[in-house]
Amino acid sequence: DLEFLARYTNAHWLVRRAPGTADDGLFVRGRDGKPLAYDRNTDQIVDAARTDISPAMRGCFPLHEAAPGDGGSDGEAVPAFQLLLDRYLDERYSPDAVAGQTGIDADRIRRIAAELAHAAFEQEISLDVEWTDWAGRKHDKIIGRPVSMHAMRGISAHSNGFQTCRAIHLLQMLLGSIDCPGGFRYKPPFPRPAPPGPKPAGKPHQVS
């Protein structure tokens, strides 16, 4: 969900590529310290927080004479999302490559991935409700993604469990299923939605 990523994440922020320098791998920032993005409408590097831009999510952009006020070294920059693509689409992480490590058949991995994508994008929820987002932009409908996930102590207590949780929540972001209709499990103990939802089912007197 590229619109979700651009609106609510830093996927479009530019990351400097300048191997051998202290700035390599850091976000590109302007003189005021604000992160920068590449605007496809104007073909310029601008404040990433602007709401009137169409930020590039992929590509590589030269920085010399391009980043206004940027005090870092010359070089090039890519959107953070590009780095994610480069890693996730690497052949080392293909279903066939990881099947043996995970103990899950490659065809089953593909099937589950297809089911997640189908539910999120082919069965999206559309509610005709007007609302205003964090940047003051007004919308005439709410889009929901009927895909929800839950991670708590069971995963985080395992070795490398934090990275497992990170992968789960990155997947939620890629699908645009965070803080939207369909993105919450019914009566989960945590994370709690805002505003709070029904109390979790437990003892008989706690069930509503």
Language-model region placement:
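Extended redox/cofactor-interaction regions of prokaryotic respiratory oxidoreductases
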Residues: 64, 169-208
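Long, compositionally biased
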Residues: 127-150, 158
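Long, well-ordered, tryptophan-enriched scaffold segments
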Residues: 1-131, 136
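Short helix-capping/linker segments at secondary-structure and domain boundaries
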Residues: 2, 157-160, 175-182
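Conserved phosphate/anionic-ligand binding catalytic regions in large, soluble enzymes, centered on
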Residues: 151-166, 170-173
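Short runs of predominantly hydrophobic/aromatic residues within well-ordered alpha helices
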Residues: 81, 109, 146, 164-168
